[in-house]
């Protein structure tokens, strides 16, 4: 498992291409050859970029779901809707498919935000609004999620 670090602001051109920031590209370098999967996020109007190795781990888990249960089948269909494979080209650009640009409401300025083992791709205004909207709740959320005894030595 990888641990990506950083938040990067960049621009998307009219074709949906973004130049991957060099600091992020260095972190992703070991995974470049295998490519990436890009998809709609489940909880926000942003996109998620999975290194192929991380995607395969997730798919192995999803393959364990019983497809004869309607909820599982519905979840798989909706989770994988619009999923695309993408690569960083020789110029260091990543092409975001048009349908996903539309889903995320991406205009021109975007934010690439590390989320442990994936990268979230946000329209800059939506990202800032999301952080602003949830800032009051973050202390309570942090306590609820991380404030138990399950994490020995984590502070």
From Swiss-Prot:
Q: Which SUPFAM superfamilies match?
A: AbrB/MazE/MraZ-like (SSF89447)
One Gene Ontology MF term: transcription cis-regulatory region binding
Q: Mark the transmembrane ranges.
A: none
Q: What PROSITE patterns does the record tag this protein with?
A: SPOVT_ABRB (PS51740)
Cellular component per GO, a single term: nucleoid
Q: Which domain of life is it from?
A: Bacteria
GO aspect biological process, one term: negative regulation of DNA-templated transcription initiation
All copies of domain SpoVT-AbrB, residue ranges? 7-54, 83-126
UniProt protein name: Transcriptional regulator MraZ
Its gene is mraZ
